């Protein structure tokens, strides 16, 4: 391979992964959230000028509904343009306040009123106005929406593409097993039109899956008569009738093939086919060669054939026979008598020319177009009396109007391609030349003028009959060329259009009033329906989902998810096996591995790494072009339809130095099959080996060595990993980790290059490079505020930590700060643990995991979870609830964490049951006598009339209070705590703005200094004309006096003026921004109706790993921690180092996930190399030797590896820094399907001076004895999953009971009990433990008196129980009584 040197960014230089990939990357990993971000950007077209907007998204929806005309046609409302305002609250404020992040949509509309009197449409007056149409949610830059304070993701939908589809019933409908073919035209919106055969080979049609009608009724409604229908669908044989006897047939020899004649077929005297013999293709050739044009046939050859047209007596005009009649002998005689010289018959046979339409016409009861329209009306609206107009309108509105029917550009393209037309454009309604030519409205005339003589409906029926005749194939609906992706933008547009259509109805009514009453557009349009539709979609649609925010990977995969469920999609119950299965077209488009287990398997998929959607919404995947066996670097994206025509080689096909394919036969894919082809026949080649898998699957090293089912679990479980306290990069990765972390948006990346000026835990300030500074007021300072200890949707902790130091030189895109689960800009979901595969006293039976106490001590798997607890004070019927520290019947001790407002302090450590917010609720009481009222008024006795309803820490939770927020309704006085929080928030914002301004100001002055020092001045404070400006002079001046300098040089004078303007502009801007922020902080909050005050308390809970927690590797090897063993008892190596985790070796063979073994070996080598580097650094080896050793690690097999690491780019200091970062282990990348080979792993182990078998002798920690054979030991990246025993374990003594049965509720959330089910009852019965059983079924469950009595007895210290009647027995008695059977218990 040629040497490919990559230049490393500031972040990458800190730690470089050794890459084992053999294929050089042609394409970088694309921006992973593009499908979301691009789709919504197209929907909004925010940055496009109104007159240049494309016909997409909001613009298209508004254009399709407007103009709205009144019923009389004298007034119309036209659409001019729209603009989006600025959002009121930014993302952070929306999250905090529970608001939705969006911007107001203002649409400019024009009301036009026409003059009634004039004959032409003269305009009376025009009024243009901006109308507010509600809030449009905005997407954050990470592809999410903030709805009511929570982040949500709109999942893309994979639905059936509009167009026409041909299918058969697989022989299931009829008992004979005959294939019944059908066609279906699916529009984007509008009625479905189906065509289908019945077992007797007649053709039927259905509209919207209703009752079926003969297809000829539909054609007749379009205006075709019997003769025209037959002419469209059949070829015609012409017979000339001889006056006395016999018939002459105009011969087309091909049409005789397969027939058996009962007379000799001769050319003159020469007999070509004898009577009774079947005519073959050879005979046909002979006939053609002989040039026989006509054939004399006997009369009975014509009898029984089907007439293609009506036969009329020329002299009298009498109808002798109808089209579609079978000719009888009598009719033939009548034809002769009337002197008919020629008749046409349909050419049909049983083999490949079926008489389908002819059969259909025989069962068609209608004769005229009107009858057909009425028949369709009756089918669509049964029970309504049809009138001519109603029938015509209904039929026209079904398929031929733009308001009711829309194929869409995709549908039209698919339709035209399927019926074999070349052009992909056309009308979005079904077009029929004959039908539209007979109508005489403007729209129909325009359509007829623009289009050729085509008929969409006829062509579909023709293709269907061709397929029935055995020519043509049915479609595969699971082919990705027949399923398209609907992303956020498109779904939002549809919802918006639905809202607008509702508005349209209301506007139409009011427009008639507008003429007389002079209403303005604002008064005409009520925006509520639009706002409601959008709010409903983003808030509660099946595809608008609560974002999975466990870790960065789960965010990215959630946004890249593609679901077949949802409105207009499939349902779980109805989806069969075929839809869920992997299809050949999934290759490179949809991941073949990552899909949920369970009822949704195969219905929810993930986009492949390089997949993208094309303009029609079909998924495409990139390929490299191959010309005459030479592979080029040109990349072309192909959709599943286009790919069908090409032969495509694998990414790992062997090539030589000139990029020529070297093998004699190359393994390829063609039309879904795998085959071998010579290099000259190959058209394309895969871009990358990981093209077939999704992001999550591409993160699994050695995926190629894992069984697919386990790989699926591995990909899915990575999404459940909880971010640990200190992230640790995987020693063995795949090289895509950096891209995932970058695109997930959890890290802070530099917007522009520059130098780090100032840094603390919460903020990074960058002084931008001169070259990247824009003009105007841009002062060349970027300020990044970091997110500190915030709660995610899954209650995990989001926290960002700076990676850079003051003075570091960074470039655009460099990682400045790590987020959760990232380590120096790489995704790091778990920890690298030292693992041994061996049994250990049964503690790793059935996939259990044995942990060392060292893991707990070092907090390797300690995670922080942030819980949000809310206390709401409402206005009740009996008076308002109050939040205060004055709570009746509560000890002082219980209140010691509350301040005087009754809210817990920040920093308080609380346990289950502690009061966090004191709240009292007025309680209802009996009517007081006047005397009592008087006493109460005098002494103000309050304690008795309120009850304690404080917010307490829920059971099983303890933690530290890290934040408190108090929200107060507008117009209610804020309490002391709320004012304190408000003041501190204003202070913080003020400091933030002051700091920002100071930094900007300093940057502007520093730039100005560099521009004027050493220049000649014309004068200034204490400066004579002609003096030079010096640094010392400037230091002695007040900053604001610099602007009084008068420079000789024009450029310097301009610089001073520009600096002054910049500072003034920034000062103004900061003042305005601060005033705005201050206003938002001090204003009252918008709370739900009836809520006076709301307090949110955030608790940080620290969870250490403990028995019962679920852990997993990346290969689907999951298990539950069974025990945590003291370090001294763990097995240890000869060096004395104990292992961290002991796994069961029996978990490997039957699961067939060998990837974990390879990972362990390579991980051990990586760690060993790190140790070696550490020893070199400690011994202070010469830098040149370190450089040589690193070169040996990175480039030892540069002959086959694609990427070379060029260490000459590194200065000695950078190299030492790199070495320091590698002490923990040299990270390796083994890309999916292109990873490290066994030989390479051995080579690495050898470099690290470790045994090449990957096994070593372990010793028992408790006895010190050596185990009897060597053990596989090494490092594996192991994850802790978000299934923690703390969240699941739960105990109850007494608690809530179900209303009817009086049995305890179930589940942790309801504080329920454990169900003692029927199997448990059987166990007690088998033991004969009668009293225990009685206790279980009565006092511990639903014997109300018994359980109360039992509680009293326990309190009184009497340990006895009396079982009474279980409530469920009473329920049973009542149920039996409801069946009118009385049942009474007698003493």
Swiss-Prot record:
Record's signal peptide: none
Kinase among keywords: no
SUPFAM superfamilies found in the cross-reference section: beta and beta-prime subunits of DNA dependent RNA-polymerase
Catalyzed reactions per annotation: RNA(n) + a ribonucleoside 5'-triphosphate = RNA(n+1) + diphosphate
InterPro entries reported in the protein's UniProt record: DNA-dir_RNA_pol_bsu_ext_1_sf, DNA-dir_RNA_pol_bsu_external_1, DNA-dir_RNA_pol_su2, DNA-dir_RNAP_su2_dom, DNA-dir_RNAP_su2_hyb_sf, RNA_pol_bsu_bac, RNA_pol_bsu_CS, RNA_pol_bsu_protrusion
GO cellular component: DNA-directed RNA polymerase complex
EC number(s) from the headed UniProt entry: 2.7.7.6
Key word Cell membrane present: no
Keywords: DNA-directed RNA polymerase, Nucleotidyltransferase, Transcription, Transferase
Enzyme class: transferase
Swiss-Prot/TrEMBL GO biological process terms: DNA-templated transcription
Gene Ontology MF terms: DNA binding; DNA-directed RNA polymerase activity; ribonucleoside binding
Subunit and interaction comment: The RNAP catalytic core consists of 2 alpha, 1 beta, 1 beta' and 1 omega subunit. When a sigma factor is associated with the core the holoenzyme is formed, which can initiate transcription.
Known function: DNA-dependent RNA polymerase catalyzes the transcription of DNA into RNA using the four ribonucleoside triphosphates as substrates.
Record family assignment: Belongs to the RNA polymerase beta chain family.
Protein name in UniProt: DNA-directed RNA polymerase subunit beta
Lineage, broadest ranks: Bacteria, Pseudomonadati, Pseudomonadota, Gammaproteobacteria, Lysobacterales
């Amino acid at each position: 391979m040629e040497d490919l040197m990559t230049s490393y960014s500031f972040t990458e230089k800190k730690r470089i992964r050794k890459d084992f990939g053999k294929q050089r990357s042609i394409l970088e990993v694309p921006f992973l959230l593009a499908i979301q971000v691009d789709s919504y950007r197209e929907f909004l077209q925010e940055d496009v000028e109104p007159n240049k907007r494309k016909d997409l998204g909001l613009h298209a929806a508004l254009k399709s509904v407007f103009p709205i005309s009144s019923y009389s046609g004298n007034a119309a409302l036209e659409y001019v343009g729209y603009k989006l305002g600025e959002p009121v609250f930014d993302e952070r404020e929306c999250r905090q306040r529970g608001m939705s992040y969006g911007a107001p949509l203002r649409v400019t509309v024009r009301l036009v009123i026409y003059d009634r009197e004039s004959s032409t449409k003269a305009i009376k007056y025009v009024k243009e106005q901006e109308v507010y149409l509600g809030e449009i949610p905005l997407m954050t830059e990470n592809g999410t929406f903030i709805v009511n304070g929570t982040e949500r993701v709109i999942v893309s939908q994979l639905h059936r593409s509009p167009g026409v589809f041909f299918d058969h019933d697989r022989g299931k409908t009829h008992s004979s097993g005959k294939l019944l073919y059908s066609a279906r035209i699916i529009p984007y919106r509008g009625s479905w039109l189906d065509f289908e055969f019945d077992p007797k080979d007649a053709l039927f049609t259905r509209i919207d899956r209703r009752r079926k009608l003969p297809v000829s009724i539909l054609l007749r409604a379009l205006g075709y008569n019997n003769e025209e229908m037959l002419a469209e669908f059949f070829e015609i044989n012409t017979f000339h009738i001889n006056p006395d006897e016999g018939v002459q047939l105009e011969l087309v020899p091909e049409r005789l093939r397969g027939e058996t004649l009962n007379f000799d077929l001769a050319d003159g005297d020469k007999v070509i086919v004898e009577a009774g013999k079947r005519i073959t293709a050879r005979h046909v050739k002979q006939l053609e060669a002989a040039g026989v044009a006509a054939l004399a046939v006997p009369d009975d050859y014509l009898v029984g054939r089907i007439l293609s047209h009506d036969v009329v007596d020329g002299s009298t005009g009498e109808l002798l026979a109808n089209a579609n009649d079978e000719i009888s002998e009598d009719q033939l005689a009548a034809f002769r008598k009337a002197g008919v010289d020629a008749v046409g018959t349909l050419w049909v046979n049983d083999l490949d020319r079926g008489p389908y339409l002819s059969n259909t016409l025989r069962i068609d009861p209608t004769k005229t177009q009107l009858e057909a329209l009425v028949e369709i009306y009756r089918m669509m609206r049964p029970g309504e009396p049809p009138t001519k107009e109603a029938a015509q309108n209904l039929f026209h509105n079904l398929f031929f109007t733009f308001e009711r029917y829309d194929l869409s550009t995709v549908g039209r393209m698919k339709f035209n391609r399927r019926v074999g037309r070349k052009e992909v454009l056309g009308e979005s309604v079904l077009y029929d030349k004959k039908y539209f030519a007979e109508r005489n409205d403007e729209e129909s005339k325009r359509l007829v003028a623009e289009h050729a003589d085509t008929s969409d409906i006829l062509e579909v029926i023709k293709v269907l009959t061709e397929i029935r005749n055995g020519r043509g194939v049915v479609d595969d609906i699971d082919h990705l060329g027949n399923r398209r992706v609907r992303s956020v933008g498109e779904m939002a547009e549809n919802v918006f259009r639905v809202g607008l259509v509702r508005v349209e109805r209301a506007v139409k009514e009011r427009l008639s009033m507008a003429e007389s009453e002079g209403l303005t557009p604002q008064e005409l349009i009520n925006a509520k329906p639009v706002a409601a539709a959008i709010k409903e979609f983003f808030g509660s649609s099946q595809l608008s989902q609560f974002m999975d925010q466990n870790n960065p990977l789960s965010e990215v995969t959630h946004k890249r998810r593609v679901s077949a469920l949802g409105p207009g999609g499939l349902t779980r119950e109805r989806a069969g096996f075929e839809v869920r299965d992997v299809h050949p077209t999934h290759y490179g488009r949809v991941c073949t591995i990552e899909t949920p287990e369970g009822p949704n398997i195969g219905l929810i998929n993930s986009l492949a790494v390089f997949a993208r959607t094309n303009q029609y919404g079909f998924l495409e995947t990139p390929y490299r072009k191959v010309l005459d066996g030479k592979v080029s670097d040109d990349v072309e994206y192909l959709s599943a339809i286009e790919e069908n025509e090409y032969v495509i080689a694998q990414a790992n096909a062997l090539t030589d130095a000139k990029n020529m394919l070297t093998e004699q036969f190359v393994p390829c894919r063609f039309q879904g099959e795998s085959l071998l082809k010579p290099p000259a026949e190959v058209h394309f080649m895969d871009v990358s080996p990981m093209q077939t898998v999704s992001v999550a699957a591409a993160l699994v090293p050695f995926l190629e060595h894992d069984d697919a089912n386990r790989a699926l679990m591995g990909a899915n479980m990575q999404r459940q990993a909880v971010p640990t306290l200190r992230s640790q990069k995987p020693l063995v990765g795949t090289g895509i980790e950096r891209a995932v972390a970058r695109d997930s948006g959890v890290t802070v990346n530099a917007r522009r290059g520059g130098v780090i000026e100032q840094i603390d835990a919460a903020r990074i300030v960058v002084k931008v490079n001169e070259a990247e500074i824009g003009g105007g007021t841009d002062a060349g300072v970027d300020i990044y505020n970091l997110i500190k200890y915030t709660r995610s949707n899954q209650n995990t902790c989001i926290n960002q930590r700076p990676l850079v130091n003051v003075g570091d030189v960074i470039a655009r895109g460099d990682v400045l700060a790590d987020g959760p689960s990232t380590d120096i800009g790489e995704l790091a979901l778990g920890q690298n643990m030292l693992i041994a595969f061996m049994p250990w006293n049964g503690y790793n039976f059935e996939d259990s995991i044995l942990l060392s106490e060292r893991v707990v001590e070092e907090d390797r798997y300690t995670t922080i979870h942030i819980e949000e607890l809310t206390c709401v004070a409402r206005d009740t019927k009996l008076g308002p609830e109050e939040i205060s520290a004055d709570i009746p019947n509560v000890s002082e001790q219980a209140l010691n964490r509350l301040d005087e407002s009754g809210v817990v302090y920040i920093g308080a450590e609380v346990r289950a049951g502690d009061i966090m917010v004191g709240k009292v609720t007025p309680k209802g009481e009996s009517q007081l006598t006047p005397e009592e009222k008087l006493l109460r008024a005098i002494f103000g006795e309050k304690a008795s009339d309120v009850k304690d309803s404080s917010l307490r820490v829920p059971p099983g939770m303890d933690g530290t209070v890290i934040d408190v927020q108090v929200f107060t309704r507008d117009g209610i006085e804020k309490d002391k705590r709320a004012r304190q929080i408000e003041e501190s928030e204003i202070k913080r914002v003020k400091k933030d703005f002051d700091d920002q301004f100071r930094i900007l100001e300093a940057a502007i002055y520093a730039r100005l200094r560099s521009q004027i020092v050493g220049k000649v001045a014309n004068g200034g404070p204490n400066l004579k004309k002609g003096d030079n400006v010096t640094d010392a002079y400037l230091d002695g001046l007040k900053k604001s006096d610099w602007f009084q300098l008068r420079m000789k040089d024009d450029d310097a004078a301009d610089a001073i003026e520009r600096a002054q303007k910049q500072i003034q502009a920034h000062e103004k801007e900061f003042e305005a921004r601060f005033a705005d922020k201050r206003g938002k902080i001090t204003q009252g909050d918008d709370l739900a109706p009836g809520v006076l005050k709301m307090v949110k308390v955030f608790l940080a809970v620290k969870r250490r790993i403990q028995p019962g927690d679920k852990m997993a590797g990346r290969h689907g090897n999951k298990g539950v921690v069974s025990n945590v063993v003291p370090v001294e008892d763990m097995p240890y190596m000869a060096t004395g180092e104990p292992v961290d985790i002991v796994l069961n070796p029996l978990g490997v063979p039957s699961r067939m996930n060998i990837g974990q073994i390879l990972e362990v070996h390579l991980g051990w080598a990586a760690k060993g190399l790190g140790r070696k580097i550490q020893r070199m650094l400690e011994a202070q080896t010469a830098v040149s030797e370190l450089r040589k050793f690193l070169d040996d690690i990175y480039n030892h097999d540069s002959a086959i590896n694609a990427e070379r690491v060029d260490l000459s780019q590194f200065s000695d200091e950078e190299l030492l820094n790199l070495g320091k970062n590698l002490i923990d282990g040299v990270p390796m990348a083994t890309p999916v399907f292109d990873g490290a080979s066994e030989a390479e792993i051995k080579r690495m182990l050898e470099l690290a001076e470790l045994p090449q078998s990957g096994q070593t002798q372990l010793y028992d920690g408790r006895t010190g004895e050596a185990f009897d054979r060597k053990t596989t030991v090494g490092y594996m990246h192991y994850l802790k999953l978000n299934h923690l025993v703390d969240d699941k374990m739960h105990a109850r003594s007494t608690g809530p009971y179900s209303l009817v049965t009086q049995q305890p509720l179930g589940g942790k959330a309801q504080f329920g009990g454990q169900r003692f089910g029927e199997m448990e009852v059987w166990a007690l019965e088998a033991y004969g433990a009668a009293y225990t059983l009685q206790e279980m079924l009565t006092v511990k469950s639903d014997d109300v008196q018994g359980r109360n009595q039992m509680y009293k007895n326990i309190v009184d210290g009497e340990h006895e129980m009396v079982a009474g009647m279980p409530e469920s027995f009473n329920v049973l008695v009542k149920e039996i009584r409801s069946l009118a059977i009385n049942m009474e218990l007698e003493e």
